[in-house]
């Protein structure tokens, strides 16, 4: 192999196109395809935002008390086979055979003629009688066959009528059952309508109270680990965003420490899964349609955050109390950094009613540092 060809292959090896980053993961910190995504999910090493996956349990998705499934009963159809039994009677007719026996022509023709004629006449009369009997028997057999057929027809017609009656009764029973089911469904629908008319006020207010309590719990606890800048709680219906809680801190150091601590904790009987998130701006990650109208036509197919907000008074009180607590912490830290004489003068001035110039100057210095 030539050195030039080897160098060209090495150049081609290192000049491959870089992996394409997943825009949804970079912008929202979650992707519908997860690890199976064809694009690159670049996890940040340092970030001000952490993701608490599926921490919020949305009652509208998990509680089945307010949803009634319309069950469709399976109807079994029965098919009745009508079989008509036809009796075939085989009649055996009698066949008469007439044997003509030859007579010897002797010299006594005149004597035997009368006897023969009489015998022939008697035989003919007997044969005629036998044929008459045969005809009569044959006619009687035909009549019997016809009678049997007619009786079979009558029986078959009666069976068909009975089957028709049974079928009609079955259809009537099915129709009555269907009518009963329809009436029950109508009653259930009416009950659902009345329940829906009664439930929304309760469910909306109760769910908002529950969410406010949840928001307050996580805000108070996480604010002890670092100063919170913003929180976004997702109420999406898809799996990769449902219940996700995004917490943005004032500093990346606070986010890093909070991430380590939260991964060791439990909430509501379940372990907390925390991770650094690449989300830098919640406004870009939020669904504008859901934010403006609290509704999204894409529903579960939407890959942007459907953020649920707490009550305004609770949110304001939480952020105000956090700001106050961190201001007091900063004051304590500043007091530790002040020189000894200023600290002693500030302590004595707190006891005095009128105060002096040293105390005023120390407080002014603290306020300037805070600003």
From Swiss-Prot:
Signal peptide: none annotated. GO terms for molecular function: pre-mRNA 3'-splice site binding; zinc ion binding. Residues 115-124 have a biased composition (Acidic residues). Coiled coil: none annotated. A zinc finger (C3H1-type) spans 16-44, 281-309. Keywords: Cell adhesion, Metal-binding, Nucleus, Repeat, Transcription, Transcription regulation, Zinc, Zinc-finger. InterPro entries: Nucleotide-bd_a/b_plait_sf (IPR012677), RBD_domain_sf (IPR035979), RRM_dom (IPR000504), RRM_dom_euk (IPR003954), U2AF_small (IPR009145), Znf_CCCH (IPR000571). GO terms for biological process: cell adhesion; mRNA splicing, via spliceosome; positive regulation of cell adhesion involved in single-species biofilm formation; positive regulation of cell-substrate adhesion; regulation of transcription by RNA polymerase II; single-species biofilm formation on inanimate substrate. Disruption phenotype: Decreases cell adherence to silicone substrate. GO terms for cellular component: spliceosomal complex; U2AF complex. Residues 192-279 form the RRM domain. Residues 94-194, 337-371 are annotated as: Disordered. It is found in: Nucleus. Residues 94-107, 355-371 have a biased composition (Polar residues). PROSITE patterns: RRM (PS50102), ZF_C3H1 (PS50103). Transcription factor required for yeast cell adherence to silicone substrate. This is Transcriptional regulator of yeast form adherence 2. It comes from Candida albicans (strain SC5314 / ATCC MYA-2876).
């Amino acid at each position: 192999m030539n050195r030039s060809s080897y160098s060209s292959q090495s150049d081609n090896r290192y000049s491959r196109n870089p992996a394409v980053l997943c825009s949804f993961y970079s912008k929202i910190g979650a992707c519908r395809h997860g690890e199976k995504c064809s694009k690159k999910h670049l996890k940040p090493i340092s970030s001000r935002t952490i993701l608490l996956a599926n921490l919020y349990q949305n009652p509208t998705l998990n509680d089945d008390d307010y949803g009634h499934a319309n069950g469709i009963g399976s109807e079994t159809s029965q098919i009745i086979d009508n079989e008509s039994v036809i009796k075939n009677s085989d009649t055996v007719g009698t066949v008469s055979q007439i044997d003509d026996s030859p007579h010897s022509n002797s010299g006594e023709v005149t004597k035997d003629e009368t006897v023969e004629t009489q015998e022939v006449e008697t035989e003919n009369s007997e044969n005629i009688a036998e044929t008459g009997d045969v005809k009569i028997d044959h006619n009687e057999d035909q009549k019997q066959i016809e009678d049997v057929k007619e009786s079979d027809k009558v029986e078959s017609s009666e069976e068909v009528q009975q089957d028709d009656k049974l079928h009609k009764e079955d259809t009537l029973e099915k129709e009555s059952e269907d009518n009963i089911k329809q009436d029950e469904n109508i009653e259930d629908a009416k009950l659902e309508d009345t329940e829906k008319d009664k439930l929304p006020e309760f469910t909306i207010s109760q769910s908002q109270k529950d969410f406010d309590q949840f928001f307050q719990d996580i805000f108070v606890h996480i604010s002890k680990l670092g100063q919170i800048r913003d929180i976004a709680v997702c109420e999406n219906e898809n799996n990769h965003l449902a219940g996700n809680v995004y917490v943005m801190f004032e500093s990346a150091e606070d986010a890093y420490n909070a991430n380590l601590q939260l991964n060791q904790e439990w909430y509501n009987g379940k372990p907390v899964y925390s991770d650094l998130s690449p989300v830098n701006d919640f406004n870009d990650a939020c669904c504008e349609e859901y934010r403006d109208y609290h509704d999204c036509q894409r529903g579960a197919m939407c890959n942007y955050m459907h953020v649920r907000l707490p009550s305004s008074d609770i949110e304001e009180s939480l952020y105000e109390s956090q700001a106050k607590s961190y201001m007091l912490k900063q004051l304590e830290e500043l007091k530790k950094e002040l020189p000894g004489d200023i600290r002693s003068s500030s302590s004595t001035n707190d006891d005095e009613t009128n105060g002096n110039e040293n105390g005023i100057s120390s407080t002014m210095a603290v306020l300037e540092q805070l600003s």
